[in-house]
Amino acid sequence: KNSVICEMLSMYLPSFGADTVRKNISKLAGQAGKEVASEIVNLVEDPEGLNARSFDDEGTPTIKKYLIRDGILGEYLYNQAEALLAGKSSTGNGFKSSYRSVPAIGVTNLKLIGEEKSREMLIEELQDGLYITACDGMFAGADPVSGDFSLISKGYLVKNGKLDRAVNQIAVAGNFYDMLKHIRGIANDYLVTGGAGGIFEAPSVSVGELVVSGK
C-alpha cells in the first residue's frame, strides 16, 4: 500500500546522500549511473511540490532532480560540506532540523512516479499474493545500511485478482535494494506524508521476491 512505500522511502533516503556514500555505509556507493531498480522506477525530488523551497538552508538554489530515472541511479545528494569534500557543487540538499542544528542532507519533496493504472488493476494483475496495508516497527525492524527488513504486517490475501480474507501478525522480510529491482507495477493512488522536514509522495506498488510467514 502507498503508506508502506512512503515509510520505506523515509527510512532508506539517507542511502542516496553523499555523506553515507563517502563513509561507505550506503549500498548505493559506486552505483551512480548504474541500474539499481526496475526500469519502471522513477524517483524524483521536486522543490516545487507541497514543501516548496527555492533555496536550501545553506542558500543554494534547489533544483528538480531524479534520484532514480528509468531504474538508473542518478547523482547523489550533496550539501555544501559534502560537496567541498568531493570537489563537487552542492545539489541544494542542505537542510536544518532546527535553527540550532548543522545543515544535513535532506529533501524537499520526494516522489515515486506512478503509472496510469489503479490500485485495483495492480491487484488484478497480481492474481495471487498479499496486499500489505500496514507494517509495525519500521525503525526497529529495518536496517538502513544493509537494506534488510523483517516487519510485522497486516493486510489481505489476494486470490484470483481480488482481495480475500484479512491477515494479521504476519512477518514480511526482504531487502529494500532488492525490492527496487523487483517492482512489477506502480499505481496512481498517491499518498503524501511528512512535513517541513521533507515530503514523501508515493502510490501503491506491486513487488516480487519477498518472504512471508504467518497465517
Language-model-detected regions and their locations in the chain:
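N-terminal small-residue-enriched
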Residues: K1-K215
